[in-house]
Amino acid sequence: MIEVQDPFVGRTLDEKYRVEERLAAGGMGAVYRARHLLMDRPVALKFLHQRLVEDEAARVRFLTEARAAVKLRHPNAVSVTDFGQTSEGCIYIVMELLEGRTLREILSREAPLETARAISIMLQTSGAVAAAHEAGIIHRDLKPSNILITQSADHPAVVKVLDFGIATFSADDDEDVIVPTQTNTVIGTPRYMSPEQHNGAELTPATDVYSLGVILYEMLTGTVPFSGATPAEIAQKHANNAPFSPREIVAAIPPEVERIVLHALEKQPSHRPANAGKFRNELLDTAERLGLEHHAIKSAPDIEVLRDAGVESPSGRLVVDISRLREKRALSSGSNEIKILGAPPAQESKPNNEPSSSSSFIDKLKRILGKPQKSTKHN
């Protein structure tokens, strides 16, 4: 058997990225581990198929999305740091390299999750999506395989949401399906798509809220609200069927949490929370009322604040003394949400308006996308 040599492994791109190995591949491209030679640190390179560059509409949409993505700064969103093109014309994006498990992998082994754990993951996830909505980005393809859970000694259970800004063109796993409609071509994952997305209608941030509701439903119950043998069957159910009550599946789910899930799964976008920030606020308020900070909610950044206000159990889980935590909250300035549940607050996640870094990134992007058939080295 003849082994086919990967065209990128071993190459150095733009005189600073040495490609080391391919990590994953899908219908729309591939992701590689690489090393930034000037900074001596690992990065991830995501290559997009050439056909997306050669299509005029795709170039325009990609430029618009990338302009927003480079301005997005949030601790729960994967960072996009650079952009380039190979001598063959293949476009790639440079991202932070993350190690961990996707939520899909976790659910396949551990679902349903405890309510506190599910809420902790969703607060971090919705915080990143809320920041995207503030920056004018609608993700369009939120699903468990686009949510990575990283873990380390310093920051256990930190969520990273993947594929901001390029989700429309993403197909990195076997969940992705392109669903043609009469009016449009919809790219997404049928089990997590809203009714309006299935129908090819205009999308709003409420579309992402619906997907977040599906993900939270699955974390809590171990199953998605609707499934079927074909995308058309799934679309019909999303449009017309009422989901089973989560508490009918898992009785231990608090009624208040169930109401939030079902609110996000309303058929009409206007009946849902308008954006991820509003959805997250509902979830956070409910978590506080239920006292869920007493339950093993593992933190994202600012874990030390929680540790100062609580103790770790023999199993390594953190139990927080609410009275001490509120004292610390009163003494602190800035956000208090991150100090309660370890989920970065949406209102702190402003778009990055620094003209120097984002402008140079977009200028480079325009130069590359303006000449899809030919490639020259960029500065």
Where are the predicted features?
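A conserved short helix/loop substructure at the end of the activation segment
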Residues: 266-275
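Conserved ATP-binding/catalytic core of the eukaryotic-like protein kinase fold
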Residues: 1-244, 363, 369, 377-378
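Long, low-complexity, intrinsically disordered segments
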Residues: 340, 350-379
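Charged, solvent-exposed alpha-helical segments that act as regulatory interaction surfaces
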Residues: 172-175, 225, 270, 288-296
